[in-house]
Amino acid sequence: MSRYTLAIVGCGVMGQALLSAIYNAPKASDEALQYYPSKIIACNDVPASAELVEKLVSGFETSPNGIEVEIATNDNERAVAEAKVIILGLKPHIVEPVLQQIPNEDGSKLLISLAAGVTLNQLSQYYKKVSRVMTNTPAKYGYGTAIVSHSTSVEPQDKAIVSELVSQVGKCLELPEKNMDAATALVGSGPAFVLLMLESMMEAGLKMGIPLKESRECAMKVLEGTAKMVEISGQSPGVLKHQVCTPGGTTIAGLCVMEDKGVKSGIIRGIEEAARVSKELGQKK
């Protein structure tokens, strides 16, 4: 397979994260290089957004995999005509109007959609080969999580392209589409929920007299270290949580207050509500 052109239509926050990750990916092996584009066209309809992309790209060094970047404004149709793979980084409510303007005449192009709630069935009305990807803002720094679902028309070679591109932002997992709204809530919205916890821990330290800088550092390291402990130990969070508690100690006292305030149920309900809204987004025209 020869290398190809990738068009990112709607190069906003997540589009820019993927642009940066793909462009700056470490040198690929000769076998893997075929899955990387030789050129990326970053498309935006708003000049201000195009300027942000231009500013981002101006800070790039030479791509380890020889990728070129072109920035386009109000030129989706031409960019898509040139591309073999299209990443759709649009808001859900404008996905279908834009797809109507960029037809896939021969059915050969691969469409990768980042839009929450817009189903494979909806997207397949315009493109035969479709993959849905839900990632999150840590992807901008290479620590993202990406959930992928494919339509039945996506071939193994196409799946390899999606996996290679998306894995550059962090961890890539494949799930059935029925899980995508839940993944949108857990993965896509998840950083905001974790940041609320981080902010609360920082402010608790500050309230008790720890300087803000040190409170921030402590809270970040506690979250980072705890996640790593769960990963390395292989034990459930519940088991590890009880290992921290001692009879009559500080930890169990704090946990009891949090249970009284509904912290755990609030987190679960918040994620469920985010999933419900994700499902609704794809139904709005």
Swiss-Prot record:
Protein's GO biological process: L-proline biosynthetic process
Coiled-coil zones: none
UniProt keyword list: Amino-acid biosynthesis, NADP, Oxidoreductase, Proline biosynthesis
Example GO molecular function: pyrroline-5-carboxylate reductase activity
Pfam families tied to this protein: F420_oxidored (PF03807), P5CR_dimer (PF14748)
Keyword Cell membrane: no
Reactions the enzyme catalyzes: L-proline + NADP(+) = (S)-1-pyrroline-5-carboxylate + NADPH + 2 H(+); L-proline + NAD(+) = (S)-1-pyrroline-5-carboxylate + NADH + 2 H(+)
Alphabetized PROSITE patterns for the sequence: P5CR (PS00521)
Assembly, per entry: Homotetramer.
Name this polypeptide is given: Pyrroline-5-carboxylate reductase
